[in-house]
């Protein structure tokens, strides 16, 4: 009758392999942490530059932008009766040679056809919309994504003294109407809703 040979475990080898794996994992973790540390500042700087460019696009006359403190943004959201205060993301005061020339307001997420839509709106100190841009959108390409470019341009020059209304078909000249994107009324209303929030913020700041 054959006897089974006992298997001897060399604990020194096991410990050595475990130590090697630990060292490899530690080195990889340190390398990842170092990479994140090195790139974090660059990424943050790029985000700041991107947002500054976007503000200048919607409020061209501004040379400098001053952020309204978060606590004041929360107060504004409360004063204008926002059901979801968190949708008022940021408010900036645009200045040129020390004088206030207008405001930029970022709102979102308003509900579009396929998800959230964030809108940045520029409004001059005398109450005229100077431009809008869509900062973030999950809309379906070719449908909701049409809410850009030429369509955005119809907001420019509209009065910020009253809220805008989305209509199907041709708009009346000099009115507060916004022509809906064909086949994408939901997205049109989502973007316009964001702009209307910005109008309310402007009216609060200009009292």
UniProtKB/Swiss-Prot annotation:
GO terms for biological process: electron transport chain. The chain crosses the membrane at residues 18-38. The keyword Kinase does not apply. Its main location: membrane. It catalyses: 2 reduced [2Fe-2S]-[ferredoxin] + Na(+)(in) + NAD(+) + H(+) = 2 oxidized [2Fe-2S]-[ferredoxin] + Na(+)(out) + NADH. InterPro entries: FMN-bd, Ion_transpt_RnfG/RsxG. One of its GO terms (cellular component) is plasma membrane. Its EC number is 7.2.1.2. Its cofactor is FMN. It is a single-pass membrane protein. It is found in: Cell membrane. The modification FMN phosphoryl threonine is found at residue 185. One of its GO terms (molecular function) is electron transfer activity. Keywords: Cell membrane, Electron transport, Flavoprotein, FMN, Membrane, NAD, Phosphoprotein, Translocase, Transmembrane, Transmembrane helix, Transport. The complex is composed of six subunits: RnfA, RnfB, RnfC, RnfD, RnfE and RnfG. Belongs to the RnfG family. Part of a membrane-bound complex that couples electron transfer with translocation of ions across the membrane. Couples electron transfer from reduced ferredoxin to NAD(+) with electrogenic movement of Na(+) out of the cell. Involved in caffeate respiration. This is Na(+)-translocating ferredoxin:NAD(+) oxidoreductase complex subunit G. It comes from Acetobacterium woodii (strain ATCC 29683 / DSM 1030 / JCM 2381 / KCTC 1655 / WB1). The lineage of its organism: Bacteria, Bacillati, Bacillota, Clostridia, Eubacteriales.
């Amino acid at each position: 009758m054959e006897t089974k040979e006992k298997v001897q475990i060399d604990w020194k080898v096991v410990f050595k392999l475990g130590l090697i794996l630990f060292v490899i994992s530690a080195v990889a973790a340190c390398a990842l942490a170092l990479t994140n540390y090195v790139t974090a500042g660059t990424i943050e700087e790029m985000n700041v530059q991107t947002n500054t460019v976007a503000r200048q696009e919607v409020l061209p006359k501004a040379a400098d932008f001053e952020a309204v403190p978060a606590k004041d943004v929360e107060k504004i959201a409360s004063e204008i009766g926002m059901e979801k205060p968190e949708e008022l993301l940021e408010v900036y005061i645009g200045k040129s040679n020390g004088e206030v020339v207008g405001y930029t307001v970022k709102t979102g997420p308003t509900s579009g056809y396929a998800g959230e839509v964030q809108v940045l709106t520029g409004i001059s100190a005398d109450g005229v919309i100077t431009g809008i841009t869509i900062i973030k959108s999950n809309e379906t390409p070719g449908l909701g994504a049409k809410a850009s470019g030429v369509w955005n341009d119809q907001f420019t020059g509209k009065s910020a003294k009253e809220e805008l209304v989305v209509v199907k078909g041709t708009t009346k000249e000099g009115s507060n109407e916004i022509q809906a994107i064909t086949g994408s009324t939901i997205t049109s209303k989502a973007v316009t809703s964001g702009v209307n929030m910005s109008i309310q913020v402007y009216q609060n700041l200009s009292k």
